[in-house]
Amino acid sequence: MAEKRDYYDVLGVGRDASDDEIKKAYRKLSKKYHPDINKAPDAEAKFKEVTEAYEALSDPQKRAAYDQYGHAGMNGGFGGGAGAGQGFGGFGGGAEGFGGFDDIFSSFFGGGARQQPNGPRQGSDLQYRMDLKFEEAVFGKETKISYSREAECHTCHGSGAKPGTSAETCHKCHGAGQIQVERQTPLGRMMSRETCDVCGGTGKEIKSKCDTCHGTGREEERHTVKVKVPAGVEDGQQMRLQGQGEAGSNGGPYGDLFIVFRVAPSDEFERDGAQIFVEVPISFVQAALGDEIEVNTVHGPVKLKIPAGTQTNTVFRLRGKGAPKLHGTGNGDQKVTVNVVTPKSLNSKQRDALKAFAVASGDSVNPQDNNLFDKILNKKHKK
């Protein structure tokens, strides 16, 4: 048996290809090699190869398994892939390692009788990146998104057959969806069951294929869905929209859509969960004497009292002025760090006042009145 080609090479895309790039490559190649269009002897084999590659790389879990294990990750030999988690937090881990004795024989002999290839199959999951401004992530928003997906064919309603006709029982597997195959194994010649290569495991054979989908039962559509972004989401978090992925097969349900949030940084604030951080400059006079200053928060400006004698890098807490708690109630806090700023230049009155302050404090200081540039000028004037 010829060695399988790399799925990325089959589709002609790089390993860092986006979902849209993979889908475009598949559409182009599937049309090129579709047996109803291309009559070349190897067209059907290439069409199946392209379809197999797309089914693996268009599914986030299957693609992750393939990237890690190669073709071995596609036959169940490395345990379960990551299962899609509900709500937030990404894809939950679901790997369980090797299964029982039946799983070992399944990997040797093509799946065994436990598989139901002609049963309903859920459609592939999709991933969508949503870019949010800092404030949108804090307060949430409602919006609509549009994306391409494989949907049930509107002409044949997923049957793959021309309207007025129906699929017939497969002549090769007689409706079982599987065929018996004899092969040589380390234990000798064994009989195994594999998915029927004529009907693809459906048990049905389409003689008169739908003109719209060419018998696949699916077509590409531009799908629009409303999304309610919860207040308090963070960069990298995911939200699942059930049933908004691609169409299933054999009457199976649609897959899910995973929205990945990418939050732009703020020029003023930093954030860690529900806590928001900001730095505010104050003068050394404000720090020494105390003051009431205005501080910006995501909820609007508020007043903050600065006690007399405040030191630089002192942190103040504004309770309830942070971001909403995503998995709780109420808001977090905003922490304000004050930085005492030393003036870079003083006029004569300010300088005299500081000298008087130094004398009153008993400090012995040697003021550096002139900078290097001033000293050079003074030397020139003296000459």
Swiss-Prot record:
Broad class of where this protein is predominantly found: cytoplasm
CDD domains per UniProt: DnaJ (cd06257), DnaJ_C (cd10747), DnaJ_zf (cd10719)
SUPFAM superfamilies, alphabetized: Chaperone J-domain, DnaJ/Hsp40 cysteine-rich domain, HSP40/DnaJ peptide-binding domain
Zinc finger (CR-type): 140-222
Induction of expression: By heat shock as well as salt or ethanol stress.
PROSITE patterns, A to Z: DNAJ_1, DNAJ_2, ZF_CR
Cofactors that this protein relies on: Zn(2+)
Gene Ontology molecular function terms on file: ATP binding; heat shock protein binding; unfolded protein binding; zinc ion binding
Intrachain S-S bonds: none
Domain J: 6-70
Entry keyword Transmembrane: no
Binding locations of Zn(2+) 1: C153, C156, C210, C213
Keywords: Chaperone, Cytoplasm, DNA replication, Metal-binding, Repeat, Stress response, Zinc, Zinc-finger
Free-text note on domains in this protein's UniProt record: The J domain is necessary and sufficient to stimulate DnaK ATPase activity. Zinc center 1 plays an important role in the autonomous, DnaK-independent chaperone activity of DnaJ. Zinc center 2 is essential for interaction with DnaK and for DnaJ activity.
PANTHER family: CHAPERONE PROTEIN DNAJ, DNAJ HOMOLOG 1, MITOCHONDRIAL-RELATED
Subunit text: Homodimer.
Protein name according to UniProt: Chaperone protein DnaJ
UniProt source species: Latilactobacillus sakei
